[in-house]
Structure formats: C-alpha cells, structure tokens
Amino acid sequence: MAHYAIGDIQGCFDELTALLGKIGFNHGTDTLWLTGDIVNRGPKSLETLQFCIRHENSVQIVLGNHDLYLLAVGCGEGALKRSDTIEPILKHPDGGKMLDWLRAQPLLIREGGRVMIHAGILPQWRIAKAESLAGEAEAELRGKKYVKFFSKMYGNKPAAWDEGLEGYARLRFIVNAFTRMRALTFKNELDFDYKSTVKKMPPYLRPWFKAPDRQNLDHTIIFGHWSSLGYTNADNVISLDTGALWGGQLTAVNLETEEITQVQAAGGIDWKSFAK
C-alpha cells in the first residue's frame, strides 16, 4: 500500500493517466491526494473530474481556485472566459451531479502529521485553527445559501487576518488564504499580484512558508498552486505544482519515501492565442 500526492492537473488528464501508470498506482490498495485545481485550461477537464468521482474511494482532493471558479460559474456567479475548458462539464447531462460532488469536497485534509491544502496555510494559524476555519467555509459551500456565498467570494480584501472578521469578509479571507496565497508582506498581508519565482521576489515580500513566526511547522504541508515555485521539499512543506499546464511536468510524490516521479507534459498553453 502506497500513499501518493500529485500537483495541479488542470485538465491535463493524459498526463495524469501516464503518471499513474509510471508509478504503478493500484486503486485497490493505494491512495492518492490531489492538491486541487483538477480542472480548467487543460484540454480534458471533464475527464479529470469524472476520474476523481469514479475513484473517490482511493482519490481525495482539496478544492483549488479553479475548482471554486467552476462551481461559481455553474451557479451563475461567474462568466466563462476564452481560456476556460470547463464548458463540457457544464453542458454534460450529469453536470449538476458532478458540481454537487465537487461542492462537497474539502478545502483541507489532515492525516497524521500531513496536511494537504491547495495554496497554503497562513503562518499564524496552527493546524487545528486552519482545520476549524476550513470547516467554516466548507459549511457555507455545502449549505443552502451556497449561491450567495459564491456571489460574495471574489475580492482581494481583507488582506490581513483578524479574528474579529465576520460574515462574508471572514469567509472570503479564509478561501483566499487556502486557495490563492503565494506571497505575503512582512505583516502577513496577502499579496495577489506576485506569481513569479522566489528568487525574483521583491524584498518587501516573502513566501508564506518562509515567515519566521510560522505556527504550523509541526506538520508537513502539501500544496500546489504556485507553478513558478516548482517542486520544493523544505521548511516542512512539499510544493507539487510543476507547471504541467504550461508544458512542464506533472509530479507525484510518494509520501512515505518522498521519492518523486514526473511525466513531461505533451504541450502547453500558448497564451498569445487568447490575446487575439
């Protein structure tokens, strides 16, 4: 029995199939964690989502920003863009059932000393606190007022955590931290503009996992989201988004041995085509 984690797939289903074949994944005995952003921009978002649903006994996902975007569009709180590849899901006869399944998925998974989240965990949040906050947002996602939740979800404010935050401002910050965070100011404020490498990061920012006051070093945090960061295994974090969507690799890590396995992506998105 082996336990693997794989980074952002974003509809790159052929690469996922090849990677599972390369590691010899067995749905009967092995388990798989996916770091979120299972859909969108890659060519086979529908097939990837169907795979996750079909194998839910062996595959666990956390929600990423693109998965939440699919849910928002699906309930009328978002508009499709030229770069999106989620329309086949929305038009599928079972599209509603697939969205209901996706909406029931967690933002955070903890098993023993490991935690999986899409983007990261705020440095000042202990793991128990992060679990509790994830539960607040998950309750809204799964509740009767989920459409209103999606109507209030988008926005970059508040930028900093305050325990006194309430209502949708509180929920928005929680979701932004878990699904969009990369860089922080030295006051632990979220910065959504910076998306490049750590080496090129301006001096007034730092990666969320490099904050000196981190309260969650007692767990290994597995995440994706930051493709320009690439594979990283340091500071009690394992970063797994290695840019399959952009012509990079799709990466799996054996969580017991920390051995990584990669497959080269077949192609990559040419964003110039979307600018025409």
UniProtKB/Swiss-Prot annotation:
Catalytic activity of the protein: P(1),P(4)-bis(5'-adenosyl) tetraphosphate + H2O = 2 ADP + 2 H(+)
One Pfam family hit: Metallophos
InterPro entries named among the record's database cross-references: ApaH, Calcineurin-like_PHP_ApaH, Metallo-depent_PP-like
Superkingdom of the source species: Bacteria
A molecular function GO annotation: bis(5'-nucleosyl)-tetraphosphatase (symmetrical) activity
UniProt keywords, alphabetically: Hydrolase
EC numbers for this chain: 3.6.1.41
HAMAP family in the record: ApaH (MF_00199)
Family: Belongs to the Ap4A hydrolase family.
Protein role: Hydrolyzes diadenosine 5',5'''-P1,P4-tetraphosphate to yield ADP.
Protein name in UniProt: Bis(5'-nucleosyl)-tetraphosphatase, symmetrical
